[in-house]
A protein has these predicted regions:
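Intrinsically disordered, low-complexity linkers and terminal regions
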Residues: 1-102
Length: 102
């Protein structure tokens, strides 16, 4: 008997695991809140916020990662911010899982 696997949509992303979808919903709420607090008229503050968020691994699902990417692209457009000052976004633990050997 073949059971259909459930799917969960969050912010345009499709998840097959409920746990990941729940995490993505939490991250979506966090992103909404952060968007009200991050002042894009102050790139230095955006850079500090962005780097701290990356260092603390606040986001682990595509929902949060896409927000970080949006901030990263914004920062790269600021002429006086060095590219080397903008941390890369880690994705090794996407969905909160370690990469597993097959």
């Amino acid at each position: 008997m073949h059971m259909e696997k459930r799917q969960y949509e969050v912010e345009g992303f499709l998840f097959t695991e409920e746990e990941a979808a729940v995490q993505a919903k939490k991250e979506a709420s966090g992103v909404s809140y952060m968007k009200t607090k991050v002042d894009r008229n102050n790139p230095e503050k955006v850079l500090k916020f962005y780097n701290r968020t990356v260092e603390e691994n606040v986001f682990q699902t595509p929902v949060g990662i896409s927000y970080l990417y949006e901030l990263q692209q914004y920062l790269r457009e600021i002429p006086y911010i060095e590219a080397s000052a903008i941390l890369p976004i880690p994705v090794d633990k996407l969905h909160g899982k370690e990469n597993q050997a097959e």
